[in-house]
A protein has these predicted regions:
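Short functional hotspots at interaction and active-site rims
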Residues: 1-162
């Protein structure tokens, strides 16, 4: 996620061109990491900069693992930083099961749909600093109701216990 997020489409009165201000400075890259349960977002973190193996390992050990319950299933895509043995060990030591999605299959990843809504919210709000992104994330995550989270999970073909 970058601080140059803008809406891609706009409306304007008939006969006039839609226009908007675009920042011309260098943007900043931020990484949003979260876990999606059928009831809520959990283990949410925002990092200043791109994701690397050290950052992901710290996220798993310090943020994700404390929220896991025995029997939880952690589903990860095939990003290289997800395949660290220390990450696997930390998740399994918490009593959770680790599963990887098939390659090139975002349709099976419910958090991708939720992040699309999240990015639309951030585009409308136009954060330009790391602090603004963090503040807006708190606001945006409150917009996700438990029914909506369950629907994201169901839409990807997973069963949701009632």
């Amino acid at each position: 996620m970058t601080t140059d997020l803008l809406r891609r489409y706009a409306r304007s009165p008939r006969g006039t061109r839609a226009s908007d201000h675009t920042p011309c400075s260098h943007w900043q890259t931020h990484t949003v990491v979260a876990a999606l349960r059928p009831t809520e977002f959990t283990a949410t973190a925002v990092f200043d900069g791109p994701m690397d193996s050290i950052t992901f390992r710290a996220y798993v050990e310090q943020v994700l693992v404390p929220t896991l319950r025995p029997g939880d299933v952690v589903v990860l895509d095939n990003l290289a930083v997800h395949k660290q043995p220390a990450v696997h060990a930390a998740i399994e030591q918490a009593g959770a099961h680790l599963r990887f999605l098939p390659p090139y299959s975002p349709d099976f990843n419910p958090i991708e749909q939720a992040f699309a809504k999240l990015k639309a919210f951030l585009r409308a709000a136009r954060p330009r600093t790391f602090d603004q992104v963090c503040d807006l994330m708190r606001t945006a995550l409150a917009l996700f109701l438990s029914d909506e989270c369950a629907n994201y999970v169901r839409h990807c073909g997973y069963r949701v216990a009632t």
